């Protein structure tokens, strides 16, 4: 029988976290990136940032980092940041679904937390609320989730 893992009690100080951030919708993604970096650095973590052109390019980099981490156990988690704004066609929906499915498969295959904060949003107002707000920033939430998952994985 597995013992119950209480991640709050397992201390993960430091660690190395990769952040993959899209260059598309830079204003919003950069705000999430700054917030995530700040949260991770506050926890004593080392942060590696990789910038990619758009959200669709995030999974291939996540897969490469996850595979390399499987070989040398260097990363505690991979955080993926992007903003996709819906338009008049279904293009954004297709990109969002492809990214979501790929990131889920990567974390299952490589057994490394892949934190999905590639936001599929209706409009710029939603982007402002989720990325630029002082009280609410998805970059901060992504970093907190990554730290929590690092604790969980270390405890297994």
Enumerate the language-model features and the residues they cover.
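N-terminal beta-loop-helix "entrance" segment that forms/cooperates
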Residues: 49-64
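Generic secondary-structure signature for well-ordered alpha-helical cores
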Residues: 26, 34, 41-46, 63-67, ...
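Short, ordered loop/turn segments at secondary-structure junctions
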Residues: 23-24, 52-55, 83-84, 119-124
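Short, basic, low-complexity termini and linkers enriched in Ser/Thr/Gly/Pro
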Residues: 1, 5-13, 67-77
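Glycine-rich phosphate-binding loop
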Residues: 61-69, 74-103, 107
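C-terminal binding/interaction regions
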Residues: 15, 92-156
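Glycine-rich phosphate/diphosphate-binding loop of Rossmann-like nucleotide-binding domains
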Residues: 8-52
């Amino acid at each position: 029988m597995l013992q119950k893992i209480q991640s709050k009690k397992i201390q993960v100080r430091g660690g190395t976290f990769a952040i993959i951030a899209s260059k598309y919708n830079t204003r919003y993604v950069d705000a999430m990136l700054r917030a995530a970096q700040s949260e991770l650095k506050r926890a004593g973590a080392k942060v590696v940032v990789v910038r990619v052109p758009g959200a669709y390019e995030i999974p291939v980099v996540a897969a490469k980092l996850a595979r390399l981490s499987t070989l040398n156990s260097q990363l505690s988690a991979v955080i993926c940041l992007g903003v996709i704004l819906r338009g008049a066609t279904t293009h954004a929906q297709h990109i969002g679904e492809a990214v979501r499915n790929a990131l889920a498969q990567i974390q299952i295959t490589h057994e490394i937390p892949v934190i999905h904060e590639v936001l599929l949003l209706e409009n710029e107002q939603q982007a402002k609320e989720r990325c630029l707000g002082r009280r609410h920033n998805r970059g901060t939430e992504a970093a907190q989730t990554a730290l929590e998952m690092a604790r969980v994985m270390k405890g297994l």
